[in-house]
UniProtKB/Swiss-Prot annotation:
This is Vacuolar protein sorting-associated protein 29. The gene is VPS29. InterPro entries: Calcineurin-like_PHP_lpxH (IPR024654), Metallo-depent_PP-like (IPR029052), Phosphodiesterase_MJ0936/Vps29 (IPR000979), Vps29 (IPR028661). Changing residue 117 to A: Loss of in vitro protein phosphatase activity. It is found in: Cytoplasm; Membrane; Endosome membrane; Early endosome. It comes from Homo sapiens. Changing residue 8 to A: Loss of in vitro protein phosphatase activity.
Length: 182
């Protein structure tokens, strides 16, 4: 089961669109679920995600116009409970102790957060944490040189094989990270 994890698009305010090389990789009919950390910013970005998969879950980012997106969400995909937040609630941004507290409050196997615009994936206390980064490479308040990235999770029973796609220069680099539920 393929799950697309992305966020912080900031279209059209900080970027015009997803990189063309990412659009070629993201084709309708291959992905079953989309988990978005927010900051889509427009209905057009949401509509695009709906063309890729029927099951789209989005949380509200600090720049989203749609106030109907929830602040947080917990979804179950296969054997995994997955928590989804934008990440602007985590102070300081990306702080491990704050993320671990949210993971325990949500009682999830995987916590997905964004806001920093930088990809991260790691295990902590037998739980898995993912920040997909910014799919467009949009700048954040602290940095202008952001590497565009998104994540595909391939969920198979009690294992998640995570593929991070990063656009470095003109090349899409792919890294594989595996997490097994204890």
């Amino acid at each position: 089961m393929l799950v697309l994890v992305l966020g912080d698009l900031h279209i059209p305010h900080r970027c015009n669109s997803l990189p063309a090389k990412f659009k070629k990789l993201l084709v309708p009919g291959k992905i079953q679920h989309i988990l978005c950390t927010g900051n889509l910013c427009t209905k057009e970005s949401y509509d695009y995600l709906k063309t890729l998969a029927g099951d789209v879950h989005i949380v509200r980012g600090d720049f989203d116009e749609n106030l109907n997106y929830p602040e947080q969400k917990v979804v179950t995909v296969g054997q995994f409970k997955i928590g989804l937040i934008h990440g602007h609630q985590v102070i300081p941004w990306g702080d491990m102790a704050s993320l671990a507290l949210l993971q325990r409050q949500f009682d999830v196997d995987i916590l997905i957060s964004g806001h920093t615009h930088k990809f991260e994936a790691f295990e902590h206390e037998n739980k898995f944490y993912i920040n997909p980064g910014s799919a467009t490479g949009a700048y954040n308040a602290l940095e202008t040189n952001i590497i565009p990235s998104f994540v595909l999770m391939d969920i198979q029973a009690s294992t998640v094989v995570t593929y991070v796609y990063q656009l470095i220069g003109d090349d899409v680099k792919v890294e594989r990270i595996e997490y097994k539920k204890p």
